[in-house]
Curated annotation (Swiss-Prot):
The keyword Transcription regulation applies. The gene is ABF1. Extensively phosphorylated on Ser and Thr residues. It comes from Saccharomyces cerevisiae (strain ATCC 204508 / S288c) (Baker's yeast). Belongs to the BAF1 family. This is ARS-binding factor 1. Residues 624-628 are annotated as: C-terminal sequence 1.
Length: 731
């Protein structure tokens, strides 16, 4: 696969290969930078692989690389210096009488214009090109676009071997075409297993010029014994015929374009024999063009290994004025191999998109257009319409002429992508002006429209948020109502239990209420009003913003019940422990009642049980009242949130009751200690009961244990240290 990729890229184009660099034969020269671009543009169009200018230095050194970052393809092009250095580096430059950097075909063109005035019947006048960009002279050039005049007898055609008659018929047609252009194709000996192809270009002979008609009649039979042109060999080319046909097609394509321009005819005129022309040389040239087109259609088919695309790029429409830097230029280093197959390259549409910026810059002078629009529109390009420019600028015409596209190829998607490239180019221009501080951003009409649109969007958002906030508010309010109803029912039950506990419990509850008032004032931390909208003015707060504030406050109120304080958690644990103790006492009570029918024992146990139960009920009553009071404080808090002056009052109360709150925590710890003492009493009672069960045959021990338990319940100071939990000792 790698071998196929290497050959496919290296030998697809007769110039872009290893032999392009300076070597033993002196390499190839390009008179201008535009001549090099003609070659590289054709190469990248055939391969659909964009070649980018990676670096340049003072218009002397240029680095070209593949558009893929990891691809090793690279060409280094450098300025070759003056004419003296050029003569020493090229063996064929000794006979070159043209000034440095001036193509040979331009010199011939100037001489031929004088001959055209003298002899209008010369059929070779149609071969003169009017576009000097198409042709360039290189030393030892295999694939070139030279237009030499057939009357110039200095152009001698040479052959390495005298076996011209041994070529097949297909090669004969191609050789005839090249001989008319001053170029011939040579083959090595037939004994080689791999044929070698080379193309020599005729040079000026020292002998004097002869008549043009003699040169035209005996053009194909002249042979020069002196070999003054060195050739390039391609040892890896599989088939000479494929390379020859590809080169013949390229030259024929350029010739047909040049003749059409010169005669003022369309491209299709070359496919018809001009029967009305009295000049036989013109007929001969037209027939040659027909043969070239036929050979080209065969050579560029999809099955031919020497060509990739069915169409060649039209170099006539290139505007290389900016690239026409005088040379000569030579390739100092080349790495023609790619690391990716041709199938992975770009499609024609994507390839064209990569060329849009350069066409805008060089061909359409888009920078000048933007600058003109910028100056005429008060330092802005807002009036510049990209869609109108795509249709009216002639960009599509350039793409159709250069890359062989038709109007049907420009689909809507491709046009939008082209417009996007132009928009990107325009955006870079605007960014450059903004960095310079020259761009005018003030656009009242557009800004007012944007403000109106933003207001509409905000109003729609507010409407949606209002509906959502209202639904959430309804859910939260309903949930709060149901929870408050349940709490009120529980509080009513607890109040009825409190009435049965006596005056002592009422005093304790009153004390607990005062404590809870201080606790709620300490626990309440007034929040700042949230910033509703940092872009809104104070008088532009919407209804949704107010509803969000209410929603946050309601959520905060609900979180108080969801996340109780540490004192409430401790009280809940103590309540659960007391309930377990009561259940155990009841079970022990039933077991004792079944075994002992003594009324005295039952009465004593009932006294203990009632005392414990009353203590637990009083604790539950205190906790329920605390919960009820906390609910009341939550309601008051919601009201306080709406009144800032009451919030300030709460802050003052908080600072004044700080010390009382600290005392409150100490009192809560004492209450927890009392509960733990009750649990100790229960554990002592359990031990005595177990002892009684083990010695049920001795009832007098039970009476003593019960009496001792009653005495300990009445007087807690008589408890020994062993029966007190370690954390409560010494208190």
């Amino acid at each position: 696969m790698d071998k196929l990729v290497v050959n496919y890229y290296e030998y697809k184009h007769p110039i872009i290969n290893k032999d392009l660099a300076i070597g033993a034969h002196g390499g190839k020269k390009f008179p201008t930078l535009g001549a090099w671009y003609d070659v590289i543009n054709e190469y990248e169009f055939q391969t659909r692989c964009p070649i980018i200018l990676k670096n340049s230095h003072r218009n002397k050194h240029f680095t070209f690389a593949c558009h893929l970052k990891n691809c090793p393809f690279k060409v280094l092009l450098s300025y070759a210096g003056n004419a003296a250095s050029s003569e020493t580096s090229s063996p064929s430059a000794n006979n070159n009488t043209n000034p440095p950097g001036t193509p040979d075909h331009i010199h011939h063109h100037s001489n031929n214009m004088n001959n055209e005035d003298n002899d209008n019947n010369n059929g070779s006048n149609n071969k003169v090109s009017n576009d000097s960009k198409l042709d360039f002279v290189t030393d030892d050039l295999e694939y070139h676009l030279a237009n030499t005049h057939p009357d110039d007898t200095n152009d001698k055609v040479e052959s390495r071997s005298n076996e011209v008659n041994g070529n097949n018929d297909d090669d004969a047609d191609a050789n005839n075409i090249f001989k008319q252009q001053g170029v011939t194709i040579k083959n090595d000996t037939e004994d080689d297993s791999i044929n070698k192809a080379s193309i020599d270009r005729g040079l000026d002979d020292e002998s004097g010029p002869t008549h043009g008609n003699d040169s035209g009649n005996h053009r194909h039979n002249e042979e020069d014994d002196v070999h003054t042109q060195m050739t390039k060999n391609y040892s890896d080319v599989v088939n000479d015929e494929d390379i020859n046909v590809a080169i013949a097609n390229a030259v024929a394509n350029v010739d047909s374009q040049s003749n059409n321009k010169h005669d003022g005819k369309d491209d299709d005129a070359t496919n018809n024999n001009d029967g009305q022309d009295n000049n036989t040389n013109n007929d001969h040239n037209n027939n040659s063009n027909i043969n070239n087109n036929n050979v080209g259609s065969h050579g560029i088919s999809s099955h031919s290994p020497s060509s990739i695309r069915d169409t060649s790029m039209n170099l006539d429409v290139f505007n290389s004025a900016t690239d026409d830097i005088p040379g000569p230029f030579v390739v100092t280093k080349i790495e023609p191999y790619h690391s990716h197959p041709l199938e992975d390259n770009l499609s024609l549409g994507k390839f064209i998109l990569t060329k849009i910026p350069k066409i805008l810059q060089n061909d359409l002078k888009f920078d000048q257009i933007l600058e003109s629009s910028y100056n005429n529109s008060n330092h802005t390009v807002s009036k510049f319409k990209v869609s109108h420019y795509v249709e009216e600028s002639g960009l599509l015409d350039i793409l159709m002429q250069r890359y062989g596209l038709t109007a049907e190829d420009f689909e809507k998607r491709l046009l939008s992508q082209i417009a996007r490239r132009i928009t990107t180019y325009k955006a870079r221009f605007v960014l450059k002006k903004k960095k310079m501080g020259e761009y005018n951003d003030l656009q009242p009409s557009s800004s007012s429209n944007n403000n109106n649109n933003n207001d509409g969007e905000l109003s729609g958002t507010n409407l949606r948020s209002n509906s959502i906030d209202y639904a959430k508010h309804q859910e939260i309010s309903s949930a709060g109502t149901s929870s408050n109803t349940t709490k009120n029912v529980n509080n009513n039950k607890n109040d009825s239990n409190d009435d049965n506990n006596g005056n002592n419990n009422n005093d304790a509850s009153n004390l607990m209420e005062s404590v809870l008032d201080k606790t709620s004032s300490h626990r309440y931390q007034p929040k700042k009003m949230p910033s509703v909208n940092k872009w809104s003015k104070p008088d532009q707060i919407t209804h949704s913003d107010v509803s969000m504030v209410g929603l946050d406050e309601s959520n905060d109120g609900g979180n108080e019940n969801v996340h109780p304080t540490l004192a409430e958690v401790d009280a809940q644990e103590a309540r659960e422990t007391a309930q377990l103790a009561i259940d155990k006492i009841n079970s022990y009570k039933r077991s004792i009642d079944d075994k002992n029918g003594d009324g005295h024992n039952n009465s004593s146990r009932n006294v203990v049980d009632e005392n414990l139960i009353n203590d637990m009920d009083s604790e539950d009553a205190h906790k329920s009242k605390r919960q009820h009071l906390s609910d009341i404080t939550l309601e008051e808090r919601n009201e306080d949130d709406k009144l800032p002056h009451e919030v300030a009052e709460q802050l003052r109360l908080l600072s004044s009751h700080l010390k009382e709150v600290e005392n409150l925590h100490q009192n809560n710890d004492d209450d927890v200690d009392d509960v733990m003492v009750d649990v100790d009493v229960e554990s002592q009672y359990n031990k005595n009961t177990t002892h009684h069960n083990n010695h049920h045959s001795q009832p007098h021990h039970d009476e003593e244990d019960v009496a001792g338990l009653i005495g300990k319940a009445d007087d807690e100071e008589d408890l020994s240290d062993e029966n007190i939990q370690p954390e409560l000792r010494g208190q």
